[in-house]
Amino acid sequence: MEKINNWEEVEAKGMEDFKPLPIGAYECVIKDARINVNEETGKETFKVSIDIATGDYKDYFKNRYEKNTNADKKWDNNAVRYLAYQGDNVAYFKGFITSVENSNSGYKWDWDETKLKGKKICGVFQYEEYEKQDGTRGIKVRLNKFRSLDKMKDIEVNDSVKLINGSYVSYNEYNGTKTINNSANIEDFGDVVEITDDILD
């Protein structure tokens, strides 16, 4: 084996450095909000990127981004939601906007999405199944929905797993049908999305 370049300068890391995010409802801050156009389908969605704002997991996704040593590192897709806002989905998009308004005193949506940056909102993170590059499946903790901050204390997050087909099973039932364990299934850096430098401000 040939010696790796900069071996002496590389900081050693172990699995103990990775602290998985538990499922639950968190006070979050919006880091970025913009119209997203799918390059393949041309479909427009409203992309919202967030981070944890308070508590033991404050800046969780920012810290993961900064610790990622990959040259093409990107913001973790587990902290991003793509919201449809056309046709029958208008009501759901309005639900998101209303949650932002209710969570930020004095804020009123004026159709300028750049003003959403820095606004607080409740983010609910739950288990979700995904397909790995080798074709096998595992689960990860991903942003599932938004709620108003005043509703956060009443939110009960169960341990159900959202499957790829859209249905739900309990975490124990999922593990019962897979030869997997908790630590092996939570993806470390998961899917990622491209960000700009100002998202970290």
Residue ranges of each PLM-predicted region?
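Short beta-rich binding modules
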Residues: 1-201
